Amino acid sequence: MKEYIIAQNQNIMRYHDFPGKETPILFIHGLGCAGSFDYPEVAAQAELVGHRRILIDLLGSGFSDKPDDFSYTVKDHVDYLYGFVYELNLQSFIIFAHSLGGPIGIELAKRCGDQVTALVLSESNLDPSSV
């Protein structure tokens, strides 16, 4: 797995980055899940293999750090993910977001604007303010 060091707090978010020449897909998992555990089989599907596939473990999940002093709000997740997108130089990408990842994906898409070419939500809470 790769590591992204979050500038604001020096915590480490871990992720898989599978190569592909088509539009990158950023997978944002839900509560009780982790990209490293729940999405490798999905990312291996023939229909997706041409895409660059980025499977993250949000802070507090999977192999990423689990800091006690992090608030775990949608906004705080979006803050470091926006930096992550910038660090990876994702000029154009797709967001796939599940469950709690949904409001995170919605807010990240708002912040990234035209960089996000599609937003796919699965079993998502559509109101970020309610999380």
Please identify what each model-predicted range represents.
Residues 91-130:
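Conserved hydrolase catalytic core segment
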Residues 41-46, 70-72, 112-113:
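Glycine-rich, phosphate-binding/catalytic loops in enzymes
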Residues 37-39, 64-70, 130:
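Conserved catalytic-core motifs of eukaryotic protein kinase domains, centered on the activation segment
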Residues 10, 48-50, 90, 113-114:
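Short, well-ordered coil/turn elements that cap or connect secondary structure elements
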Residues 55-96:
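Active-site loop/oxyanion-hole signature of alpha/beta-hydrolase fold enzymes
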Residues 1-12:
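N-terminal cap/lid segment of alpha/beta-hydrolase-fold proteins
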